[in-house]
Swiss-Prot record:
Binding-site list for 2-[(2R,5Z)-2-carboxy-4-methylthiazol-5(2H)-ylidene]ethyl phosphate: T131, S132, S133, G161, I181, S182
Protein name: Putative thiamine-phosphate synthase 2
Family: Belongs to the thiamine-phosphate synthase family.
An annotated GO BP: thiamine diphosphate biosynthetic process
Function: Condenses 4-methyl-5-(beta-hydroxyethyl)thiazole monophosphate (THZ-P) and 2-methyl-4-amino-5-hydroxymethyl pyrimidine pyrophosphate (HMP-PP) to form thiamine monophosphate (TMP).
SUPFAM superfamilies: Thiamin phosphate synthase
A GO CC term assigned to this protein in UniProt: cytoplasm
Enzymatic reactions: 2-[(2R,5Z)-2-carboxy-4-methylthiazol-5(2H)-ylidene]ethyl phosphate + 4-amino-2-methyl-5-(diphosphooxymethyl)pyrimidine + 2 H(+) = thiamine phosphate + CO2 + diphosphate; 2-(2-carboxy-4-methylthiazol-5-yl)ethyl phosphate + 4-amino-2-methyl-5-(diphosphooxymethyl)pyrimidine + 2 H(+) = thiamine phosphate + CO2 + diphosphate; 4-methyl-5-(2-phosphooxyethyl)-thiazole + 4-amino-2-methyl-5-(diphosphooxymethyl)pyrimidine + H(+) = thiamine phosphate + diphosphate
Matching InterPro entries: Aldolase_TIM, ThiamineP_synth_sf, ThiamineP_synth_TenI, TMP_synthase
A Pfam family this chain is assigned to: TMP-TENI
Protein keywords: Magnesium, Metal-binding, Thiamine biosynthesis, Transferase
Amino acid sequence: MELPRLYAITDRKKYGENFLETLEKILKKGVRMVQLREKDLKDRELYKLAKEVRALTKKYKALLLINERFDIALAVEADGVHLPEQSFPPSVVKRVNPNFIVGFSAHSLESAKYAEKEGADFITLSPIFKTSSHPEAQPIGLKTLKEVSEKVNIPVYALGGITWEKIKVCYKNGAYGIAGISMFLE
């Protein structure tokens, strides 16, 4: 399966009061892969929101991945999960559901290679640039993006401080796609 090039990551605090309306605007712009990443929600709240997001992503024929919560992903019939770097290995997900798309958050060449070896379908590599989402994180830069993109055989999504003006330079440095939170709100 060919993955979409744009990957939106949700953030209720940045989306504002009309979460689903904001997400629908993003989908109307052509984004076809969404990660529901709302770590602060309790199980029942996350499940309820995930069901609503699943209905919306189906309407736009977009893929839905749930951040780390394999149980919620199964319950709402999402297309897969996105695993943080310190989460369980992608191979565990693939063993339970071989059809699930598994994304993995990598922050170095080492973790990108680990993700590939463990069966991840793609990685997000971050932060490429300084980002408001994680102001304490040191940017890894375009050189690392290029190196990782050349040394792994799975799609690499550039993430972190990406603006519409920086997309082209990310693609020039090997990015398969672009992931982000704020950029899709512009």
